[in-house]
């Protein structure tokens, strides 16, 4: 992933409001929490939809993303209270994912829009010394930055 910018660090938490209060003690300011509908999450051969409640730090990049645990998969409470992912911006995450799979990395989950376009893909943390990497596409990052700035954007 040479040259790929790290744009945010995601932390999965049990209680988003409590986590915001705690991280604020570090001098971070967070946007108001929002609920984001994930229309299509593909994980372990199954597809589901879910609502993610998240908040990003105003400070950054890299920003802090706090996500409230939900469901029984990659965002489930069994994965909470620890680093969830490091987001890496890539101009073509679909091609990059294919390259990394050829190199032996495994994808554990991916989010898609209704039209089938990729939002983010997650690499197996077992392939990176316990760190999950989220590959994120530039238009998604642009929407996140607009959202942090208070604009009404859809990531």
What feature does the model see in each segment?
Residues 6-14, 55-62, 65, 71, 76-94, 101-155:
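Vicinal oxygen chelate
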Residues 1-45:
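Long, hydrophobic N-terminal alpha-helical segment
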Residues 44-48, 88-89, 110-113:
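Short linear motifs in intrinsically disordered
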Residues 17-36, 78-83, 93-113:
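Extended intrinsically disordered, low-complexity coil regions enriched in Ser, Thr, Gly, Ala
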Residues 30-76, 117-140:
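Conserved short beta-strand elements that form part of the metal-binding/catalytic scaffold
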């Amino acid at each position: 992933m040479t040259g790929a910018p790290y744009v945010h660090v995601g932390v999965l938490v049990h209680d988003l409001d409590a986590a915001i209060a705690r991280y604020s003690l570090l001098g971070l300011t967070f946007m108001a929490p929002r609920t984001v509908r994930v229309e299509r999450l593909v994980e372990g051969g199954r597809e589901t939809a879910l609502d993610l409640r998240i908040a990003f730090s105003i400070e950054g990049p890299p920003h802090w993303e706090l996500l409230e645990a939900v469901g029984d998969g990659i965002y489930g409470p069994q994965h909470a209270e620890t680093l969830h992912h490091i987001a890496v911006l890539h101009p073509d995450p679909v091609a990059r994912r294919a390259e990394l799979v050829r190199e032996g990395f495994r994808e554990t989950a991916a989010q898609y829009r209704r039209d089938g376009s990729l939002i983010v893909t997650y690499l197996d943390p077992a392939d990176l010394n316990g760190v999950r990497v989220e590959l994120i596409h530039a238009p998604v990052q642009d929407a996140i930055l607009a959202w942090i700035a208070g604009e009404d954007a859809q990531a």
